Amino acid sequence: MDLKPRVIRSEDIYRTYWLYWHLLGLESNFFLNRLLDLVITIFVTIWYPIHLILGLFMERSLGDVCKGLPITAACFFASFKFICFRFKLSEIKEIEILFKELDQRALSREECEFFNQNTRREANFIWKSFIVAYGLSNISAIASVLFGGGHKLLYPAWFPYDVQATELIFWLSVTYQIAGVSLAILQNLANDSYPPMTFCVVAGHVRLLAMRLSRIGQGPEETIYLTGKQLIESIEDHRKLMKIVELLRSTMNISQLGQFISSGVNISITLVNILFFADNNFAITYYGVYFLSMVLELFPCCYYGTLISVEMNQLTYAIYSSNWMSMNRSYSRILLIFMQLTLAEVQIKAGGMIGIGMNAFFATVRLAYSFFTLAMSLR
């Protein structure tokens, strides 16, 4: 007989996420961590995209500009999103506290099995996929420099000295670019894994709430008092979920708008680079992996954003599926008001304009294709 208590722990999903912040020097009071945070802020978050942008202005051909534009846009928006999330860490922690409270409400074997076999597994797959995609993108970029031939920097960039003066200066500059882009990727892992991972957990908790709602009044020994208590507890769970949604709207309002712009630009320019400016196999591999990374960066967030809306819409049916017909008028009145609350459409928007869902994903892909056709016409 299995005597192990059935519990779910949403915070376990976020262990790797908080590790990213620790590696970047945040969420710690140690002096060395604060010093590391200062160094990364100056030389990576601020200076790294600036030196890439200045390098673009120094390029003389359209091909070189197109080659440098994807990573420049990616690093700029990585810093932009990282700053946005950094100022929202208190809200992110508040969301995690609400998740812990909702975890305590999942007591049945059915709820625990669903969360652990579906929600938790999918959320873990999300952050692992980002690590693989971004890691491969970084490795292919480094390989394109080390084995691609020539004496070129990792990316077109401006330095306040002659990079080609000596071998030592050149390789120090390349080392800075490799270290900088690796830390920028670490920042992007924190930026991009959080939205889809959290959306997945929210959708999972909405499904658990639907399970509890549909079971209200179905037990053979449930009294009117116990049934009413279960309804009030479910209403409180719904309130917490809506609070999480409001916090997510605040947290992702600006950062996800930057995400959509960055993805649209990068997908289109990367396609142009693959077709016209990739001059060796390493470059083709790099741009191909980079293109897949850009798609992966956007798709999970939009998919689980839509899933939240779908699961929220199912709550009304779950309430109706409960045993409400044998209850008194007071209970039915509360139930009816609760049903009306669940009819409201739930959607998280980027910039207060773009709903984070599959419609936005396909719109971004269409925008990228429009940029691509424009570039083809200007060729």
From Swiss-Prot:
Subunit: Interacts with Orco. Complexes exist early in the endomembrane system in olfactory sensory neurons (OSNs), coupling these complexes to the conserved ciliary trafficking pathway.
Other remarks on this protein: The atypical heteromeric and topological design of the odorant receptors appears to be an insect-specific solution for odor recognition, making the OR/Orco complex an attractive target for the development of highly selective insect repellents to disrupt olfactory-mediated host-seeking behaviors of insect disease vectors. Odor-evoked OR currents are independent of known G-protein-coupled second messenger pathways.
Protein name as it appears in the record: Odorant receptor 33b
Primary localization: membrane
Record's subcellular location: Cell membrane
Topology term for the membrane: Multi-pass membrane protein
Pfam family, one: 7tm_6
Stretches that traverse the bilayer: 38-58, 65-85, 130-150, 166-186, 257-277, 282-302, 356-376
Annotated family: Belongs to the insect chemoreceptor superfamily. Heteromeric odorant receptor channel (TC 1.A.69) family. Or2a subfamily.
Protein keywords: Cell membrane, Membrane, Olfaction, Receptor, Sensory transduction, Transducer, Transmembrane, Transmembrane helix
Tissue expression summary: Expressed in 15 cells in the antenna but not the maxillary palp.
Gene Ontology terms for molecular function: ionotropic olfactory receptor activity; odorant binding; olfactory receptor activity
Superkingdom, taxonomy of origin: Eukaryota
Side of membrane Cytoplasmic, spans: 1-37, 86-129, 187-256, 303-355
Coiled coil (UniProt feature): none
GO CC entries: dendrite membrane; membrane; plasma membrane
Extracellular membrane side: 59-64, 151-165, 278-281, 377-379
Gene Ontology BP terms: detection of chemical stimulus involved in sensory perception of smell; sensory perception of smell; signal transduction
Gene source species: Drosophila melanogaster (Fruit fly)
The protein's role, per its UniProt record: Odorant receptor which mediates acceptance or avoidance behavior, depending on its substrates. The odorant receptor repertoire encodes a large collection of odor stimuli that vary widely in identity, intensity, and duration. May form a complex with Orco to form odorant-sensing units, providing sensitive and prolonged odorant signaling and calcium permeability. Involved in the behavioral responses to pentyl acetate and pyrazines.
